Amino acid sequence: MKQSNLCPDCARAALRLPRQAGRGAIWLYRHTLSPLVGYHCRHLPTCSVYGDEAIGRFGLWAGGWMTLARLLRCQPWGTSGIDNVPAEPPGGARWYLPWRYGRWRGVND
């Protein structure tokens, strides 16, 4: 039987697709809607930069939950100031407990 010539990096590329799709959505927001709405984020780095970095570092699932928590904190009664993406995911975070990925109040403990 003939052995097929499958791409050796196909599995790795397939696993990167969700991450690239999430980062692509953020890129699209930054270059279309954000200039129309205006730049007025309460945090540094901005929420879109935070989301791009979180998804790039932790993947779409964990980084997406971190970004959602950040977006919910970025409102008039929310937090403000310097709020970087954590270097590692929170200790109690699991894929089946996604809300534990986000920091829902406060900035950089």
Swiss-Prot record:
It holds the Pfam family YidD. This is Putative membrane protein insertion efficiency factor. GO terms for cellular component: plasma membrane. Belongs to the UPF0161 family. InterPro entries: Membr_insert_effic_factor_YidD (IPR002696). Could be involved in insertion of integral membrane proteins into the membrane. Keywords: Cell inner membrane, Cell membrane, Membrane. PANTHER family: MEMBRANE PROTEIN INSERTION EFFICIENCY FACTOR-RELATED (PTHR33383:SF1). Its main location: membrane. The keyword Cell membrane applies. It is a peripheral membrane protein. It is found in: Cell inner membrane.
